[in-house]
Structures are given as C-alpha cells and as structure tokens.
C-alpha cells in the first residue's frame, strides 16, 4: 500500500506527504520503485515531512531513500521524538486527499481512505506531535570535525 501511495503521489501531484512511524523499519523506503516515485513526485512547491522516534533504521536499512533525502533536503522537514513510546507515535502516511493509518503496526493492520473526517483528525494528531512533542532530527548531512 505504501508503494502504491507514493506512485499515486507522483502521478496525481500531491502537494504534501507526511509520514510518521516509530522507526520505519518495515516501510519500503529504500526500494528502487519507491525512490523513483518520490523522485518523480518531488517538484517545486512540494513538502515532505517525516516524524519518528528514531531514524537509526532508516539510515541503516534504506540507503536509497537517505540519498534521495539529501538531494531533496529543501522540501523536507524531519522531526524526532526520542522519548516517545514507540506504540504511541502514529504510524501514518498522510496527504491532503488520502491517509493510511496503521492502528496495529505489529500486525500491520489499519485503515486507509480519502474520507475528510479521517484526514482532518489524523492531521490534527500529527500536528500536535510535530508542534509540541518533537524536535528537528535526521539531518541531510552529518558534519564532523
């Protein structure tokens, strides 16, 4: 479903994508098809936001995505909430027209659809996390001395 969502985002030109998960361990972010979809999607005026407890698994498991993230840093906002309970952080792919929410990430069970009520409610929850329960994270480059 995540693969199809990113392909749809590219095809339909979604203005914004927001993804949230404790660590994105089981998301297909590093797959060639996903990164190609994101590459096709990324244009001026687009926004991509990520929220996680930790980005360690993203860096370790999704090298193609990490490379894409570095290229498109100017459209990305990455936030982290390291003290959050991993089961408390929503596991979501949100766009202005469609949302996928994993209600049970362990069993990968959830809901998806374009219903306005669901999209608004999920976005409000995500906004709360982004505004008051997280801080900047997952820099596009790591500068060392």
Protein language model regions, located:
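PLD/PLD-like phosphodiesterase catalytic module centered on the HKD motif
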Residues: 1-18, 22-145
